Amino acid sequence: MATVKVTLIKSVSGRIPNHKLCVKGLGLRRIGHTVEVQDTPENRGMINKAYYMLRVEG
């Protein structure tokens, strides 16, 4: 299955709680942290909710 590289580029401090949970669900812990996640509808939904804090490649 295809993968997507996701990087946290903005802080989760002061954000909507559901968006914080989406970032945590993607496995991101700190600013600049990059993870590779599978390109599934579930992960795409989390990325779409918190898009303004993330950089997505691939």
UniProtKB/Swiss-Prot annotation:
Gene3D superfamilies: Ribosomal protein L30, ferredoxin-like fold domain
Record has Cell inner membrane as a keyword: no
A GO MF label: structural constituent of ribosome
A cellular component annotation (GO) from this entry: cytosolic large ribosomal subunit
Keywords, sorted A to Z: Ribonucleoprotein, Ribosomal protein
InterPro entries documented for this protein: Ribo_uL30_ferredoxin-like_sf, Ribosomal_uL30_bac-type, Ribosomal_uL30_ferredoxin-like
BP GO annotations: translation
Superkingdom per UniProt: Bacteria
Keyword Disulfide bond: no
CDD domains given in the database record: Ribosomal_L30
Family: Belongs to the universal ribosomal protein uL30 family.
Quaternary data: Part of the 50S ribosomal subunit.
This protein's name: Large ribosomal subunit protein uL30
Gene: rpmD
